Every structure is written in C-alpha cells, then in structure tokens.
C-alpha cells in the first residue's frame, strides 16, 4: 500500500473487511486526516486487516497504537501485518480493552453495516473513552448515513466538524465540547 508519506505491505483475507484491496473510504481517511500527534494512545476501532492501525504506528512510532476488532481473523491479520512492517501495534478483542482506558486519538472506518443502533452503541462506547482533548476521525459513506450520523453525534453533545468529502465519503472530526 502506498500513501504520499508511506509505503508498506499488508495481507488481507476473505471474511475480513475490504478483502484484496484498500477500500476507498479508508484510503480517503489515510490521505486526508490531520497528521496524528507524535505520542499518545491511539485506537483503530474495527481494524480489519489493519491499514489504519499500521499507518498510525508508522506515522507516530512513539504512540501506543491499539487495533480493536471482534473478528479473530482480522486480529490475526493486523498482528501479522504489524510484524511484517516492523511496527508496534497492540491487537485486541473489544471485550479485552481495559474499562478505564482513555484514548487521545481514534481513527476509524466504523462498521456501518452492523445497523444504526449497534453503531450508535459502538460509537458511544469508544467516543466516551476520548481524553479531554482527544479526537476521533471517522470516515463514513454518505449513502450509508454519514449526514444523519453527524446530526446524531451533535444531538449527543459531541463537537462534530466535517473535514472533507470525496467520492461519496465524509471525513468527520469528533471531540468533546469545550466551554
């Protein structure tokens, strides 16, 4: 996979999101998201084969990068891809993340197809882990509810801004409101 600032290899497999290629939503996030801080705790929620987690680890080698996915094959692939690219990524099942863990940065192409209620629960859980100055960068397909999700996040008192749009995707920045 080649990005403007990085080149790395990764393996995908059937049964894991975006088998055989980097999906256009994730590519948009990786190309357009603001540069991550040099350090902190970063999470890729719904990591799939790990392109987001690997990018975070390569761009911010001093950060603690955690890749989370309920799919065991996705976790295996992410761990193998991190090893192959010589980066440090902690790969875990969501149930094994410590309840008190706070996060400075979330990058995610969240699993929209799990359904509206399940997605809202997932986002409520992970956004609730953001540190006071933490930020989540989410890429959402416009045709799969990006604008309604944006409105819902605002009604839940999150500060949301659209960082960009491309090829039917929205790139959103989500953070805690500050007085």
State where each predicted segment sits:
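SAM-dependent Rossmann-like transferase core, predominantly class I methyltransferases
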Residues: 1-39
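Conserved SAM/SAH cofactor-binding pocket of Class I
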Residues: 24-108
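Short beta->alpha hinge that forms the Motif I/post-I loop of the SAM-binding pocket
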Residues: 69-73, 118, 141
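Glycine-rich phosphate-binding "P-loop"
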Residues: 105-117
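Short "lid" loop at the C-terminus of a central beta-strand within the Rossmann-like core
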Residues: 112-114, 141-146
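A short glycine-rich, Lys/Arg-flanked "PGG" loop and its adjoining helix->strand segment in the class I
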Residues: 120-132
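Conserved beta-strand signature within the Rossmann-like core of class I S-adenosyl-L-methionine
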Residues: 133-140
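Class I S-adenosyl-L-methionine
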Residues: 145-179
